[in-house]
Amino acid sequence: MRAEKRKKKKKILYTIIALIGIFVLSTGSYAYYLWHKAASTVANIHENINKSKKRDSAVDIDNHDPFSVLLMGVDERDGDKGRADSLIYMTVNPKTKTTEMVSIPRDTYTEIIGKGKMDKINHSYAFGGVQMTVDTVENFLDVPVDYFIKVNMESFKDVVDTLGGITVNSTFAFNYDGYSFGKGEITLNGKEALAYTRMRKEDPNGDFGRQNRQRQVIEGIINKGANISSITKFGDMFKVIENNVKTNLTFDDMWDIQSGYKEARSKVIQHELKGDGTKINGIYYYKADESSLSDITAELKESLNK
């Protein structure tokens, strides 16, 4: 099933890049400082991965080639390497003016590439970091991963507090981790925002509902961040980004995407990976429906080849 959603706030890739792009595109008396600080920050968060074996040649952003990106929300804490609790695969095609995306449930049962075993897909990060996660997602969806952006979910609270709080629209009221969240428009501080993104067992949509709340928080951060006027807050944001974000996108890549791929925001298509929950040796897993997975793979490949 495909649900088409017009641009407005459903620009998941662009919200992540815009977290840095806000600084890149800033104007005013300190624009020169921000430009160089942004470039320095991107250089510090850069992390290479192997070129996809599913690509004959590398993607050319300058030529406006369609590309893919894997968004990884990692729940890392002190003394714990963490797991990839949010995996969103996206294709971006400026020629068809379309961005396509699929959220992969964290409990999805699949082969962990490089580990030689079947397990939950989010365990791939704990076993082998970014590279093993990328390899596993490529194998599961049978599509290339050109770029990745990894964000430590713990950093949400630091970002939100730096911005002075954010506003989200909760679809239902619930309690979690000592916090109460009402239905409708609510304002969150850092710790509240983190708790808001973590609850899933009481959500009628399970992990899909949790992923939606994560996107709400990201969008709230961008909306608030777009109005930053204090150079002190800019400095604090750069520090948070350096400590909590990794990507193989370069500063030039980000600039080219912001300027050359704008039309790909015209239409966002979100695919739903159907499946069922099951238990194997007493452990819960999400088993993707083979027909649904095959259809999504075909759609993603078509998006990358147009």
Swiss-Prot record:
Q: Which Pfam families match?
A: LytR_cpsA_psr
Record's InterPro entries? LytR/CpsA/Psr_CW_biosynth (IPR050922), LytR_CpsA_psr (IPR004474), TagU (IPR023734)
Write out the pathway annotation from the protein's UniProt entry. Cell wall biogenesis
* GO CC annotation terms, alphabetical: plasma membrane
Q: In UniProt terms, what function does this protein have?
A: May catalyze the final step in cell wall teichoic acid biosynthesis, the transfer of the anionic cell wall polymers (APs) from their lipid-linked precursor to the cell wall peptidoglycan (PG).
Tell me its family. Belongs to the LytR/CpsA/Psr (LCP) family.
Please name the PANTHER family in this protein's record.
Answer: POLYISOPRENYL-TEICHOIC ACID--PEPTIDOGLYCAN TEICHOIC ACID TRANSFERASE TAGU
Report the HAMAP family cross-referenced here. TagU_transferase
Return the protein name: Polyisoprenyl-teichoic acid--peptidoglycan teichoic acid transferase TagU
